[in-house]
Design a protein with these regions (language model features):
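N-terminal amphipathic, basic helical "cap/leader" segment at the start of enzyme domains
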Residues: 16-19, 23, 27, 42-189, ...
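Intrinsically disordered, compositionally biased charged tails
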Residues: 1-13
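Intrinsically disordered, low-complexity regulatory regions of eukaryotic regulatory proteins
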Residues: 10-12, 18, 26, 325-328
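Conserved beta-strand/loop scaffold segments within soluble protein domains that form the structured core
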Residues: 148-150, 154-327
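Short acidic (Asp/Glu) and glycine-rich catalytic loops that position anionic groups and cofactors
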Residues: 35, 50-54, 299
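Conserved oxyanion/phosphate-binding beta-strand-loop segments in alpha/beta enzyme cores
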Residues: 30-44
């Protein structure tokens, strides 16, 4: 030890101080570990079968093409092996994961209309406060569905679309969703991409028109409260030519003694000379399997910035990739 210190020119006390500075303090998870009483409106039976996927499609009133997409994704999921190139996930048994849990409220655009216990959860996490101070819009998902979504009037007046995926899928932007949904991340990419294609629910849809600069961030927060459940939100963002956006994603869940699963999907389209910063802060409990897939397609002159802080989880696998002119750039 003394020889090594001498070679580096450090005294022993200096080495100790450097070691102390390099250690990251444990995160206080107390705010994240507070559980709400499980009081769901509907919980899908555990397991994955064509019958459960049909029930999910009916529950969500999917268009026909999405019903078919889900069933095709399930078939691919059943055909594909568990990936052997990452950490072991042998403790994850999909026969004991509820793939859809609907909260006891539909989506609101005013916090005062949300049930008090759910609102208290997001208050503890600081989401309404952040919206008031520094965000252009906020989406808040609780288990499998959005319970809150809102965007500032001045941002909407610029033509910026920020809504939940279900509204985009079945409303004015249905054609755009059909064009872009799971084209960057396809069900055949890997087993958990196929799982996502079969059971996805929730998430946010963003479209920024040509030349529009969104000066303050949008944020979506995904909270998984249900025990033994999965969360499979889909985020789809298109930033058109010459436009710019900063999008923030936050995730957390309380700790249970059984496995929970987060297998979200992010698809980002950055058009010519556009710019997108995508920031993620995840704070997972130690029973969480966090298996995310994120991709961006960046056209000529476009810029994508990935900023990610992913903490906790029993197993975590995050693989953001940017494609530019048919070349992949791992980030």
């Amino acid at each position: 030890m003394k020889t090594a210190l001498a070679a580096s020119g450090q005294t022993e006390s200096e080495a100790i101080r450097m070691k102390e500075k390099s250690q990251v303090a444990d995160i206080d998870r107390s705010v994240y570990d507070i559980r709400d009483k499980e009081d769901d409106a509907y919980r899908m039976q555990e397991g994955l079968t064509p019958e459960t996927i049909d029930k999910l499609s009916k529950e969500k009133d999917d268009p026909v093409w999405m019903q078919q997409f889900r069933l095709q994704s399930l078939q691919i999921y059943n055909e594909m092996p568990v990936p052997d190139w990452g950490p072991s996930i042998e403790g994850l048994d999909m026969d004991h994961i509820a793939t859809y849990v609907r909260p006891k409220t539909d989506m609101k655009n005013d916090w005062k209309d949300i049930p008090q216990d759910i609102k208290d959860t997001f208050e503890r996490l600081g989401i309404p406060q952040a919206e008031r101070k520094s965000l252009a819009g906020v989406g808040a998902q609780y288990d499998s569905e959005l319970v809150y979504h809102n965007v500032r009037d001045e941002v909407a007046a610029q033509g910026v679309v920020y809504t939940d995926m279900e509204s985009a899928l079945k409303g004015e932007y249905a054609d755009m969703v059909h064009k872009y949904f799971m084209k960057l991340v396809t069900p055949r990419d890997h087993k958990f991409a196929a799982l996502h294609g079969a059971v996805w629910s929730g998430g946010s849809f963003v479209y920024v028109p040509k030349g529009v600069q969104v000066s303050i961030p949008l944020q979506s927060y995904f909270r998984l409260n249900a025990k033994g459940a999965g969360q499979f939100e889909h985020t789809l963002i298109i930033v058109d030519e010459g436009a710019s956006l900063h999008f923030i994603e936050g995730c957390s869940a309380p700790k249970y003694n059984v496995a929970n699963l987060h297998a979200g999907c992010v698809e980002l389209y950055v058009k010519k000379n556009a710019k997108l910063r995508y920031s993620t802060i995840e704070n997972w409990s130690k029973n969480m399997y966090n298996l995310n897939t994120k991709r961006a397609l960046v056209e000529e002159g476009g810029v994508i910035e990935w900023v990610s802080g992913s903490f906790g989880s029993h197993v975590g696998c995050l693989y953001p990739v940017s494609y530019t002119h048919l070349r992949a750039h791992e980030t």
